[in-house]
């Protein structure tokens, strides 16, 4: 960890000194050391060779350098004594430790922000104001190409680094190694390269060219196009610098990686060296993109020609129109820029879910405008937001007037044609509905007409895909056979019901998918009506006679609702078959009138309910939601427990009272039986009622109770309890006189157990007095001996 921190600090200070040397200014090593004298530093020593050696892209000679640093003392610090050198080392160590480190663990190079070399807005001294290099610059890339594209076996000497950078590196490594000394060695190769580079030292063009190579993402032969692109982008950046969108566009367009390492990688490179694949793209990307905090990670040199994975988010739109898109090596950038540049282009309606569903089968005409339109009719109840209509009141009035004209023209239509319109098939109703919509939309503006036509096409496609909902739209006759005799009254009703008249479309939307409709609309099988909408009572005329002037909700409320919802519930289909039965004599379909002869039960129930519950707000709900059928609601569990205990206690008390009453009745019956006041009457007719039996036997006296028990075998009987015993004896003696000519004789007994047994039983109470043990003797007991002997002889002869 200490070695990593040491390397980071040394690299940071080394980069600061190197950039200062490139700029050509005598800058202090650190702002905290103003007393450091760097006047003896020769800037001319920083030629291309030494600069390339200082960058240390490939650190194959790092060990050689570290060994050579220990040979000779430094030439720059000859005038500094050892005490000052020790103090300087301590201050440098403290300063290097205080350098900021970014999120990736690398020191941030703030010193480059003041230079004119790393910014593309300020080109190198040799470049023209418009960003194009001078003509003599065409020969210079050849030297750099030789240096950058040197073969792997070529050994570049890093010993010719500037004394300042080398001393700084050595001083920092002093914390880990021995006190390093800096030596400046020269060999034949370095002298030759230095002599070549010294011819161009006054202009410092190799350094500027090197920076151009460092900041480009293309191959070295593409240096000039890259400069042109960078210049144009820099101009755009300077004009739009205040906009963050422009900055993120520059981040996309600017290349931020190096194309090639300064020295080619050799097979024997030490991969574990701290200087492996060192790049300065992080510093350059900070300056070029214009966003100081956005520093993407370093891209390896072998991925230089691939797409930049750290481009900005594509959601940001470009505001700079002068940026030249990158070449074909980055097609994603150009595509995203071209797509994001069209700010006015919105997501087309053809990408909606409805279009995605319909486009699978056929292509609709006018596909761009028809999905933007919404339903051209008002909605009575709430629906989904994407289905609600936002038409103006003018179109509603036009549709109302058109419907009035159609209804007046077809006023005298025959009832037979009306019946035929009711039983037409769903396919014919679709075609009639489309024709009626086209005719009713002629007087509307062309825009609304086109919208309605497109809406009809969408509906036709929906019917084709998902099946036609039964009677979802009006029939041809059902839309046009309304009769309005009183125009003032009709206009009043139309003003109350504007949503039912818009060429049939509102009726579709009315019964689509609103859950509240089940509570607000009326059901013919339920006998209810929605009186929150219609406050005019039905006619009081006979229910089986057609009354054209009767005022009631439109027929569409009662018939179209269950027909529309047949697919959702089977009860709706049952009502559909019932509502079209012959019990319904005539069915007018105008919102102003309806035949009151739908069915006997329906009219009676609805008429009675309307009279009794007309102004009741609870009547809007269904009958099943009456207050009597609702369970009580409790505020707390304790209240529920209390109510439950009360109910149980009441039930126990009721059962106790009932048992007491039953016991009392049983005691009274037993007492009446003991008192001989109960008479059993048997063999009565099966059709005899209790009232008839009571009336016939009441001639003998006052009767307290009379019951009749009927049996399947015809042996019916009854019990009559008289108030007095004497009346019971009179009925027992003279009851046979009440028999009619077509009846059998009554069996009259005093009530007891004996009437429930058969008469041939020997243990019956009625036969107890006649029982005699002697009666069981045979006929032979009365014969004498001679008679018995003769009988025996006759039996033997047989």
Swiss-Prot record:
Ordered alphabetically, the record's keywords are: Acetylation, Activator, Biological rhythms, Cytoplasm, Nucleus, Phosphoprotein, RNA-binding, Transcription, Transcription regulation, Ubl conjugation
**Region called Disordered, residue ranges:** 100-140, 213-277, 290-351, 542-599, 613-639, 650-669
Which residues fall in a compositionally biased region of kind Basic residues? 563-578, 622-631
Entry's induction text: Transcription is repressed by ZNF746 which binds to 'insulin response sequences' its promoter.
KW Thylakoid (keyword) present = no
Q: Which domain of life is it from?
A: Eukaryota
Q: How is it modified after translation?
A: Phosphorylation by AMPK in skeletal muscle increases activation of its own promoter. Phosphorylated by CLK2. Heavily acetylated by KAT2A/GCN5 under conditions of high nutrients, leading to inactivation of PPARGC1A. Deacetylated by SIRT1 in low nutrients/high NAD conditions, leading to its activation.
Residues recorded with modification Phosphothreonine: 178
Question: Motif LXXLL motif: residue span?
Answer: 144-148
UniProt GO molecular function: chromatin DNA binding; DNA binding; DNA-binding transcription factor binding; lncRNA binding; nuclear receptor binding; RNA binding; RNA polymerase II-specific DNA-binding transcription factor binding; sequence-specific DNA binding
Q: Which PROSITE patterns match?
A: RRM (PS50102)
Which residues carry the post-translational modification Phosphoserine, per the record? 539
Limits of the RRM domain: 677-753
Q: Where is this region: Interaction with PPARG?
A: 293-339
Annotated spans, Mediates interaction with RNF34: 350-798
Tell me the Gene Ontology biological-process terms attached to this UniProt entry: adipose tissue development; brown fat cell differentiation; cellular respiration; cellular response to oxidative stress; circadian regulation of gene expression; digestion; energy homeostasis; fatty acid oxidation
Database matches in Gene3D superfamilies:
3.30.70.330
Residue(s) carrying N6-acetyllysine: 79, 146, 184, 254, 271, 278, 321, 347, 413, 442, 451, 758, 779
Subunit arrangement?
Homooligomer. Interacts with MYBBP1A; inhibits MYBBP1A transcriptional activation. Interacts with PRDM16, LPIN1 and PML. Interacts (via LXXLL motif) with RORA and RORC (via AF-2 motif); activates RORA and RORC transcriptional activation. Interacts with LRPPRC. Interacts with FOXO1. Interacts with NR5A2.
This chain's function reads: Transcriptional coactivator for steroid receptors and nuclear receptors. Greatly increases the transcriptional activity of PPARG and thyroid hormone receptor on the uncoupling protein promoter. Can regulate key mitochondrial genes that contribute to the program of adaptive thermogenesis. Plays an essential role in metabolic reprogramming in response to dietary availability through coordination of the expression of a wide array of genes involved in glucose and fatty acid metabolism.
Protein name, per record: Peroxisome proliferator-activated receptor gamma coactivator 1-alpha
- The gene from which this protein is expressed is PPARGC1A
């Amino acid at each position: 960890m200490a070695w990593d921190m040491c390397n980071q600090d040394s690299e940071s200070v080394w980069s600061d000194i190197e950039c200062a040397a490139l700029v050509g200014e005598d800058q202090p090593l650190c702002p905290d050391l103003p007393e450091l004298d760097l006047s003896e530093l020769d800037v001319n020593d920083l030629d291309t060779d030494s600069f390339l050696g200082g960058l240390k892209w490939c650190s194959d000679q790092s060990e050689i350098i570290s060994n050579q640093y220990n040979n000779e003392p430094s030439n720059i610090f000859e005038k500094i004594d050892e005490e000052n050198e020790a103090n300087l080392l301590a201050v440098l160590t403290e300063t290097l430790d205080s350098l900021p480190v970014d999120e990736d663990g690398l020191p941030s190079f703030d010193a480059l922000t003041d230079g004119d070399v790393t910014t593309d807005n300020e080109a190198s001294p040799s470049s023209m104001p418009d960003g194009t290099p001078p003509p003599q610059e065409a020969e210079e890339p050849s030297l750099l190409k030789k240096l950058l594209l040197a073969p792997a076996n070529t050994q570049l000497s890093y010993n010719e680094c500037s004394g300042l950078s080398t001393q700084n590196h050595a001083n920092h490594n002093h914390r880990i190694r021995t006190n390093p000394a800096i030596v400046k060695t020269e060999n034949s190769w370095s002298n030759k390269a230095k002599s070549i580079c010294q011819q161009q030292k006054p202009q410092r063009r190799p350094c500027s060219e090197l920076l151009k190579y460092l900041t480009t993402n293309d191959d070295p032969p593409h240096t000039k196009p890259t400069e042109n692109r960078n210049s144009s982008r820099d101009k755009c950046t300077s004009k739009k610098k205040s906009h963050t969108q422009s900055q993120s566009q520059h981040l996309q367009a600017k290349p931020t990686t190096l194309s090639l390492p300064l020295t080619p990688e050799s097979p024997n490179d030490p991969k574990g060296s701290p200087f492996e694949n060192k790049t300065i793209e992080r510093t350059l990307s900070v300056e070029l993109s214009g966003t100081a905090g956005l520093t993407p990670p370093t891209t390896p040199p072998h991925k230089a020609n691939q797409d930049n994975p750290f481009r900005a988010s594509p959601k940001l739109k470009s505001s700079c129109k002068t940026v030249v898109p990158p070449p074909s090596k980055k097609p994603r950038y150009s595509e995203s820029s071209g797509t994001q540049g069209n700010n006015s282009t919105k997501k087309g309606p053809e990408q909606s879910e409805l279009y995605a569903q319909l486009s699978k089968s056929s292509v609709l005409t006018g596909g761009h405008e028809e999905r933007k339109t919404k339903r051209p009719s008002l909605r009575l109840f709430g629906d989904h937001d994407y289905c609600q209509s936002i038409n103006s009141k003018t179109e509603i009035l036009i549709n109302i007037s058109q419907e009035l004209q159609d209804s007046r023209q077809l006023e005298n239509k025959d009832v037979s044609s009306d019946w035929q319109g009711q039983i037409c098939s769903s396919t014919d109703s679709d075609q009639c509905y489309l024709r009626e919509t086209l005719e009713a939309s002629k007087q509307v503006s062309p825009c609304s007409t086109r919208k309605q036509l497109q809406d009809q096409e969408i509906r036709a496609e929906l019917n084709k895909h998902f099946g036609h909902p039964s009677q979802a739209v009006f029939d041809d006759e059902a839309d046009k056979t309304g009769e309005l005799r009183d125009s003032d009254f009709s206009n009043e009703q139309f003003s109350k019901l504007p949503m039912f008249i818009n060429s049939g479309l509102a009726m579709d939307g009315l019964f689509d998918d609103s859950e509240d409709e089940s509570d607000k609309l009326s059901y013919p099988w339920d006998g209810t009506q929605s009186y929150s909408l219609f406050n005019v009572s039905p006619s009081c005329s006979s229910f089986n006679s057609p009354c054209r002037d009767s005022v009631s909700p439109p027929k569409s409320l009662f018939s179209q609702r269950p027909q529309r919802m047949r697919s959702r519930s089977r009860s709706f289909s049952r009502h559909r078959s019932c509502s079209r039965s012959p019990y319904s004599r005539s069915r007018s379909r105008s919102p102003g009138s309806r035949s009151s002869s739908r069915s006997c039960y329906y009219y009676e129930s609805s008429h009675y309910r309307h009279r009794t519950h007309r102004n009741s707000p609870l009547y809007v709900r269904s009958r099943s939601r009456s207050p009597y059928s609702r369970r009580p609601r409790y505020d707390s569990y304790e209240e529920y427990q209390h109510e439950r205990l009360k109910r149980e206690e009441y039930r126990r008390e009721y059962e106790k009272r009932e048992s007491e009453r039953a016991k009392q009745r049983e005691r009274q019956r037993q007492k009446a039986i003991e008192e001989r006041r109960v008479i059993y009457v048997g063999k009565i007719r099966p059709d005899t009622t209790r009232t008839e039996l009571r009336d016939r036997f009441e001639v003998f006296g006052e009767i307290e109770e009379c019951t009749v028990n009927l049996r399947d075998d015809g042996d019916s009987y009854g019990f009559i309890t008289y108030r007095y015993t004497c009346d019971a004896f009179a009925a027992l003696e003279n009851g046979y006189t009440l028999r009619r000519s077509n009846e059998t004789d009554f069996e009259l007994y005093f009530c007891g157990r004996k009437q429930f047994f058969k008469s041939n039983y020997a243990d019956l109470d009625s036969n107890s007095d006649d029982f005699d043990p002697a009666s069981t003797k045979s006929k032979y007991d009365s014969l004498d001996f001679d008679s018995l002997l003769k009988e025996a002889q006759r039996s033997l002869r047989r």
